[in-house]
Amino acid sequence: ATLLFSCKQGGQQNKKNDDKPVITVTIEPLRYFTEAIAGDEFTVVSMVPKGSSPETYDPTPQQLVDLAQSKAYFRIGYIGFEQTWTEKLTDNAPHLQFFDMSENVELILDDTHAHHHKDGHVHEGHTHAGGVEPHIWNSTINAQIIAGNILNALCAIDKANENAYMERYNALIRRIEHTDSLICQMLSSPNADRAFMIYHPALSYFARDYNLHQIPIEAGGKEPSPTHLKNLINSCKKEKVRVIFVQPEFDRRNADLIAQQTGTRVVAINPLSYDWEEEMMNTAQALLTPRSPKGEGE
């Protein structure tokens, strides 16, 4: 069901300046969603630049200076960078309004399929920054919720333009729903894989949306031990995995090793890409490969 988000709750009217006001976000996918709804009303900048890990990134002194000029900060809420830096960013720019884009998202605990429920009850699972699997944007369901959170935030800080934000929000929702429809169509094919391996488990929400099995290579955020590698090779064969995803900010040597032992393909993806729709489609497309003759690798 589509949630209706009201712009009329809270917020204050912005006085327009000659210079375009700035909104800062943590990562590039969030910049994509924010720009899609904000249009030309704001300049949107990302704290974590392309090619950097949002788990370990440290902002430059210039970024901290620039942040003081921002109107608002949109955060995912559970990324390592945010866990480490939010308090410091607040101290650096006490006027800055923070908005959590994970609000109303049903969260997953790390590499498990346990859920963090709204009543605060958390099932036992792995620990990550904040104890939560943070890659909420890699999901068409969550993307619609994030879009609603962005809409509410923009209306709170700039009520005068709420109608324009609502129009762009509706257009973005249509694009997200179209992307979801195409992915559902692809993954409903009998040739579509139901399991995949990935170095860093960034596709937990993608896997949940489409009932897939994600098998992470790293163990607790660390390189796999020789024993764990052997278990992964066995899992790869047992689950009939044909694709191993690797990301640019992580070492791919273990993925290549498993691929050599199992005949699987290594496919590069970038879940942190600004081009969210294209990245989601590419990920789904990689799971839709013609079957090889029996006994042969890819």
Which positions does each model-derived feature cover?
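Sec-dependent bacterial lipoprotein signal peptides
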Residues: 1-5
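Extracytoplasmic metal-acquisition and chelation regions
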Residues: 7-298
